[in-house]
From Swiss-Prot:
Residues 155-164 have a biased composition (Basic and acidic residues). The lineage of its organism: Eukaryota, Amoebozoa, Evosea, Eumycetozoa, Dictyostelia. It comes from Dictyostelium discoideum (Social amoeba). Residues 121-138, 308-343 have a biased composition (Acidic residues). Residues 43-53, 64-77, 344-389, 433-449 have a biased composition (Low complexity). Residues 1-94, 109-229, 300-389, 428-461 are annotated as: Disordered. This is Putative uncharacterized protein DDB_G0287265.
Length: 489
């Protein structure tokens, strides 16, 4: 630990001063002043530890029995030469063990220093200073040998007076990048043609069609190449994913391509204030729906169709005229048998009474049929009312104004306007088809249309081609209305 006063705290608590002479700039030297970096601090701590150990080793040498400086070489070799006594043998053995431990400790410290330097990023000046420190001490010579060699700088060819001259390329120049690209292209056999256009990137596939990349787990992860390949594959997979659209996204309908609507504030035109806010109904412009007024007018004009008329014409009128072709004249040519004639007359009278009873029964049946027809007509009226009520409920739920599209050109003069010319089938969310007039949020069309036959803004007169163009172009989209169908009668 380095204190502010420049000392190293030892394990026993004592402070050893640091020799800062190597960090001071000498007079007359062109070298820069050294800086106290973490790497240099680590080296200083290592030097101090080694000096302390050397002192302890010297004390051990002095205190060891029979130790002599003259036979130090024999002790280094094996510790078996020199003294003949067992004490000398024990002392030399202890010294050899300490010497081996010392070498192992130095190796460990060297590895720690190298690993520490790999983690930290030092400038070139710091590396030069470290090299000078290594030259200053004998123990750091091995550290210098173990350092990895710097890669040779790329060279470029410059023709000077017809001779090629090699000059180093700076790391930040564009020529270095171009040189690297040329080398790669030479290996791949590709000519460096600047005029060539860049290849178009393939269109990314969707997530469903593109499987995730296979990561090779069999390769050794000690070498960084396999991890780099897997990460590159995974990055390529991520960037090739096309974002999927949400199923229930809100589609903004396009503005109407009719000049008449550009002045209207209906949410579709370019000049509209409510552009793209999704407002299908504006209470300031749209006429509210009145049940009493609108439905009465529609029923009078026979706009709402009822396919199930249930006329019940009752083709079997059951006239039962009972002409009684068997008039039973019975002229009774046999005048002599009067009794027989009387019996025949009685039989005929009975038959006539029977026929009269049948006629009365038939008349009663006809009355019952008429009552049934009246009931059917009442039911039809009720059905008409309920269908109108259902249409009103659907209309209120959708927040649509009741605009009824009819055709201005009628095929027959006797039929009322819009009768059996346009039929629509609206399908609700429950799947039940509802026969109803077409509802679209365009009340302003009637005010500017050429065919103004009625002042009612809810009644729109137009031709079938315009109606088909609206529904086929997708201008009207509703979640509850899943299907529109328009057909001529």
């Amino acid at each position: 630990m380095i204190e502010e006063h420049g000392g190293i705290v030892q394990s026993d608590g004592s402070i050893q001063p640091i020799d800062m002479s190597s960090f001071e700039k000498k007079s007359g030297s062109k070298k820069k002043e050294k800086k106290l970096t973490p790497k240099n601090i680590n080296l200083l701590v290592q030097q101090s530890n080694q000096s302390v150990k050397q002192q302890k080793d010297a004390q051990k040498k002095q205190t060891s029995n029979g130790f002599n400086n003259n036979n130090s070489s024999n002790i280094h070799d094996g510790g078996m030469g020199g003294g003949s006594s067992s004490d000398n043998m024990d002392g030399s053995l202890d010294y050899s063990i300490n010497n081996i431990l010392k070498k192992e400790y130095e190796k460990i410290n060297r590895n720690q220093v190298s690993s520490f330097s790999d983690v930290e990023n030092f400038s070139e000046d710091d590396e030069d200073d470290d090299a000078e420190d290594d030259d200053s001490s004998d123990d750091q010579v091995n550290n210098k040998k173990n350092k990895p060699k710097k890669p040779s700088k790329l060279m470029k060819h410059d023709s000077v007076d017809g001779k090629n001259k090699m000059t180093p390329i700076s790391s930040t120049s564009k020529k270095k990048v171009q040189h690297q690209l040329k080398e790669k292209n030479k290996k791949k056999g590709i000519k460096n043609d600047k005029k060539k256009s860049k290849p178009t990137k393939p269109t990314p596939k969707s997530v469903s069609s593109l499987p995730p990349p296979k990561i090779d787990s069999s390769t050794n992860n000690d070498n960084g190449s396999s991890d780099d390949d897997n990460s590159a594959k995974f990055k390529k997979y991520l960037f090739s994913i096309e974002p999927q659209k949400f199923e229930h996204t809100i589609e903004i309908p396009p503005f109407r391509e009719i000049n008449e609507f550009y002045d209207q504030d209906d949410g579709y035109s370019i000049l509209s204030k409510n552009k793209y806010i999704g407002n299908w109904r504006d209470h300031n412009q749209y006429k509210s729906f009145d049940f009493d007024e609108e439905i009465d007018n529609q029923l009078d004009d026979n706009i709402i169709n009822n396919d199930n008329d249930n006329d019940n014409d009752n083709d079997d009128d059951n006239d039962n005229d009972n002409d009684n072709d068997n008039d039973n004249d019975n002229d009774n040519d046999d005048d002599e048998n009067g009794e027989d004639n009387g019996e025949d007359l009685n039989i005929n009278n009975n038959n006539n009474n029977y026929n009269n009873n049948n006629n009365n029964n038939n008349n009663n049946n006809n009355n019952n049929n008429n009552n049934n027809n009246n009931n059917n007509n009442n039911n039809n009226n009720n059905n008409n009312f309920t269908s109108i009520q259902n249409d009103l409920d659907l209309q209120n739920n959708l927040n649509l104004s009741p605009i009824i599209i009819t055709s201005s050109s009628s095929s027959s003069s006797s039929s009322p306007i819009g009768r059996n010319e346009i039929k629509t089938s609206l399908v609700s969310e429950s799947g039940r088809s509802i026969s109803s007039p077409i509802l679209i949020p365009s009340p302003t069309l009637s005010s500017k249309s050429n065919n103004q036959e009625n002042d009612d803004p809810t009644l729109v007169k137009s031709n079938n081609s315009f109606i088909k163009s609206i529904f086929s172009s997708g201008k009207i989209k509703r979640n509850s209305l899943q299907e529109y169908s328009i057909r001529n009668s």
